[in-house]
């Protein structure tokens, strides 16, 4: 928001405070002033001159030789290259010795043999940005009104002896998107009164209903619509002081009618739109949602396709404006306009925001509607605009306002106690001090025994709860005056929760095992969201995703780890071992908070042991991945309760995948990627695992039992059992352990064989069995008896026979 210091002074007394001092006070109150800029930029010696004569330069086709009266004894000759310079004009002249922006000094000179004693200036040469210069003067010099006094200070007449404060407003302070709103803020800071502009309208004897009617078919989008008719207007330039204020605020002047609507926008923060009444094509205004397939050509001459999500102003048949955003070319004010319909409305933020997004049209008006205006001042702004059009466009205001409204002013009442204010701020303010601050803010209130009941003005949409009032009191009291105190509390050393400590042990173990930690996106694409997931649910979609690739929340960590492995392999890093600890997100139904579960996942591809001087290279395989997990389970005393069960999972190799169960509950899986998936990610043989980390770390560990060092020798027997190919080694091992109790202490698989020496559909599993009794030395007969019992048990359960 650009705020003219001189213009602001019309609403609040700024005596005794400079623009820079005011900027500092505003910043201290919580609204940042990014810069203070002097519009005159140090210029001096620029006066209003009268072009007495203007003739072609004898030696240059594009130059003019002008005789200019500067209000001095004799007129001076000035050579000018502007295409629009002409006899009789009042122009800005930089005299010899004048200083223009950039410390450019004007000197007497000869141009193509003719003497030039000064410079006739364009607005750009006086420091005005091209984008705000009126179009008729964009490529030439500026021409003053005919009543401008010769020899007067041109900078003063152009309103450039002013300073502009640029406010950086947070979204909650939409009230300061107007000069009056800023005036209320400054008045509160300085403890002064606000002087509001007069909006008295002189009406004729006619009534507006003879000209037009209004019907709103979408009151939820447009709670308030009002309008006035001004007839017999004469389109022309607006007064110079108004043009100067518009340009200082970054708005290009057009004509008196359009400039007045923009002036009210800046003054009240209320967007207005002026229609050429005779071009509306009917005597009614209908506000409704657009119909599918409708189009409108807006003021920028672009045809825009409309949908049912857009709000339009129509003449009962076709759109004449995209509500709150831009008017239509079919009803714009032109040089021959004589009757104007002024629209003042309150459009709700969502419908305006949708139109801005769909059409890429953001304007000063739409910005204010998006952030919220004060509907209580809508008709006041309309009256002010009608009064100005009567004064500066020669218009005749038709009696009455046409209106359609369902808006009702809801008074926001907030109660807060003095004790609460002082308790939050750490101050010792009195009731009188708080009352003075609320009075400066112009918040109506009552006070009863230290309890303040505040009726929040409609302009302050950001005030709703007691904390908002406390913040306002703190701002005006002065943040720099709040006492600085150290917290009064017992200092205690920090620490980790048991769960956090376990998670840290997991990281240390995996990194010690040779894996590197990865951190990947929580967002993924819909087609990858449920791949590899332990549990699946309807993917949770973002309301406004940046792209489809990052539009839903993940349900597994593996897809992004595979992308990381593929990324590394594409850059010649063939051996990859990564793990990630992160959250996955599962929908629990509509209006229910989604579940956020922590997972541990890993990916292994390439060599596990590479370039070992003492041994051969070893590729990552199923047993490497399983061994890493076994070590993790053993770390937390869970190994005895873990079971690996063959499983078939989508995207994994059907014969090299196992589900992992803890106490009968599946908590994860480990396996090789399906060859098709390996090809999809451009990976060689790759192994992955994923665990429900929360279940793992919350599981109760087995108590560690002391066993003395063996005093007696153990006996080791090896057996090779021929079984069907579908028999699981784990199941066979468990049967051996059960049948061999209590003497069989350890069973380990050391060989698997399939080949020509075995019948079709058979395989050989070789186990090593260790027999031991802590109380005595076992005899061969005792071991043989138990060994026979083991063989009988596996034969009965699995049809296993000793391999010959």
Swiss-Prot record:
Keywords: Aminoacyl-tRNA synthetase, ATP-binding, Cytoplasm, Ligase, Magnesium, Metal-binding, Nucleotide-binding, Protein biosynthesis, RNA-binding, tRNA-binding. Residues 40-155 form the tRNA-binding domain. Residues 409-484 form the B5 domain. It holds the Pfam family B5. It catalyses: tRNA(Phe) + L-phenylalanine + ATP = L-phenylalanyl-tRNA(Phe) + AMP + diphosphate + H(+). GO terms for molecular function: ATP binding; catalytic activity, acting on a protein; magnesium ion binding; phenylalanine-tRNA ligase activity; transferase activity; tRNA binding. Its EC number is 6.1.1.20. Its cofactor is Mg(2+). It is an enzyme of class 6 (ligase). It is found in: Cytoplasm. Mg(2+) binds at residues 462, 468, 471-472. Residues 710-803 form the FDX-ACB domain. The keyword tRNA-binding applies. One of its GO terms (cellular component) is phenylalanine-tRNA ligase complex. Binds 2 magnesium ions per tetramer. Its main location: cytoplasm. InterPro entries: aa-tRNA-synth_II/BPL/LPL, B3/B4_tRNA-bd, DNA-bd_dom_put_sf, Fdx_antiC-bd, Fdx_antiC-bd_sf, NA-bd_OB-fold, Phe-tRNA-ligase_IIc_bsu, Phe-tRNA-ligase_IIc_bsu_bact. One of its GO terms (biological process) is phenylalanyl-tRNA aminoacylation. Tetramer of two alpha and two beta subunits. Belongs to the phenylalanyl-tRNA synthetase beta subunit family. Type 1 subfamily. NCBIfam families: pheT_bact (TIGR00472), YtpR (NF045760). This is Phenylalanine--tRNA ligase beta subunit. It comes from Geobacillus kaustophilus (strain HTA426). The lineage of its organism: Bacteria, Bacillati, Bacillota, Bacilli, Bacillales.
């Amino acid at each position: 928001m650009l705020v003219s210091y001189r213009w602001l002074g019309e609403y609040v007394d700024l005596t005794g405070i400079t623009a820079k001092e005011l900027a500092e006070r505003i910043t201290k109150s919580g609204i940042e002033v990014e810069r203070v800029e002097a519009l005159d930029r140090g210029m001096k010696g620029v006066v209003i001159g009268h072009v007495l004569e203007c003739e072609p330069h004898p030696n240059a086709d594009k130059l003019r030789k002008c005789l200019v009266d500067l209000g001095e004894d004799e007129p001076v000759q000035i050579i000018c290259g502007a295409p629009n310079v002409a006899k009789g004009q009042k122009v800005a002249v930089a005299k010899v010795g004048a200083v223009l922006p950039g410390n450019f000094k004007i000197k007497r000179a000869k141009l193509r043999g003719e003497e030039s004693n000064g410079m006739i200036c364009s607005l750009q040469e006086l420091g005005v940005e091209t984008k705000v210069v009126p179009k008729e003067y964009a490529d030439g010099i500026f021409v003053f009104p005919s009543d401008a006094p010769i020899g007067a200070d041109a900078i003063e007449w152009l309103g450039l002896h002013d300073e502009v404060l640029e406010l950086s407003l947070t979204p909650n302070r939409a009230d300061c998107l107007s000069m009056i709103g800023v005036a209320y803020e400054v008045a509160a800071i300085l403890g002064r009164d606000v002087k509001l502009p007069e909006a008295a309208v002189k009406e004729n004897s006619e009534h507006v209903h003879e000209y037009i009617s209004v019907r709103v078919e979408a009151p939820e989008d447009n709670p308030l619509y009002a309008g006035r008719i001004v007839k017999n207007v004469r389109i022309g330039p607006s007064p110079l002081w108004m043009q100067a204020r518009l340009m200082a605020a970054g708005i290009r002047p057009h004509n008196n009618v359009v400039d007045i609507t923009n002036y009210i926008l800046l003054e009240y923060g209320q967007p207005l739109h002026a229609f050429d009444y005779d071009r509306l094509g009917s005597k009614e205004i209908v506000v409704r949602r657009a119909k599918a397939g409708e189009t409108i050509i807006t003021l920028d001459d672009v045809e825009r396709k409309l949908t049912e999500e857009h709000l339009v102003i129509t003449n009962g048949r076709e759109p004449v404006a995209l509500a709150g955003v831009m008017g239509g070319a079919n009803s714009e004010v032109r040089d021959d306009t004589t009757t104007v319909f002024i629209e003042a409305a309150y459009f709700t933020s969502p419908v305006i925001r949708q139109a801005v997004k769909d059409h890429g049209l953001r304007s000063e008006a739409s910005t204010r509607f998006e952030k919220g205006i004060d509907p209580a001042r809508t008709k006041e702004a309309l009256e002010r605009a009608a009064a100005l059009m009567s004064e500066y466009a020669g218009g005749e205001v038709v009696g009455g306002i046409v209106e359609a409204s369902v808006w009702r002013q809801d008074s926001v009442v907030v109660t807060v106690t003095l004790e609460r204010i002082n308790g939050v701020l750490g101050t010792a303010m009195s009731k009188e001090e708080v009352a003075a601050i609320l009075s400066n803010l112009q918040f109506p209130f009552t006070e009863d025994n230290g309890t303040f009941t505040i009726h929040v003005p409609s302009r302050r949409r950001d005030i709703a709860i007691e904390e908002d009032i406390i913040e306002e009191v703190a701002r005006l009291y002065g943040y720099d005056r709040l006492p600085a105190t150290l917290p009064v509390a017992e200092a205690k050393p920090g620490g980790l929760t048991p769960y956090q400590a376990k998670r840290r042990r997991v990281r240390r173990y995996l990194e010690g095992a040779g894996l590197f930690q990865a951190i990947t996106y929580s967002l993924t694409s819909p087609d990858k969201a449920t791949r590899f997931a332990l549990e699946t649910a309807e993917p949770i979609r973002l309301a406004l995703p940046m792209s489809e690739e990052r539009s839903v929340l993940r349900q597994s960590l593996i897809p992004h780890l595979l992308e990381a492995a593929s990324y590394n392999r594409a850059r010649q890093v063939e051996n990859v071992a990564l793990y990630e600890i992160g959250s996955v997100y599962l929908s629990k139904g509509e209006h229910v908070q989604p579940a956020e579960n922590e997972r541990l996942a890993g990916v292994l591809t390439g060599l596990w042991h590479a370039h070992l001087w003492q041994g051969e290279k070893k590729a990552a395989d199923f047993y490497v991945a399983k061994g890493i997990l076994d070590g993790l389970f053993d770390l937390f005393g869970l190994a005895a309760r873990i079971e690996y069960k063959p499983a078939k999972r989508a995207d994994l190799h059907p014969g090299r995948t196992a589900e992992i169960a803890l106490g009968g509950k599946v908590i994860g899986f480990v396996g090789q990627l399906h060859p098709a998936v390996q090809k999809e990610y451009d990976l060689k043989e790759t192994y992955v695992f994923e665990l429900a980390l929360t279940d793992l770390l919350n599981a109760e560990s087995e108590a560690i039992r002391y066993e003395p060092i063996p005093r007696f020798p153990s006996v080791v027997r090896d057996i090779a059992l021929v079984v069907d190919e579908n028999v699981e080694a784990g199941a066979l091992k468990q049967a051996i352990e059960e049948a061999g109790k209590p003497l069989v202490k350890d069973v380990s698989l050391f060989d698997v064989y399939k080949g020509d020496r075995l019948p079709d559909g058979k395989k050989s599993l070789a186990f090593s069995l260790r027999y031991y009794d802590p109380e005595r030395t076992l005899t061969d007969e005792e071991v043989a008896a138990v060994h026979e019992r083991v063989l009988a048990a596996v034969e009965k359960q699995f049809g296993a026979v000793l391999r010959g």
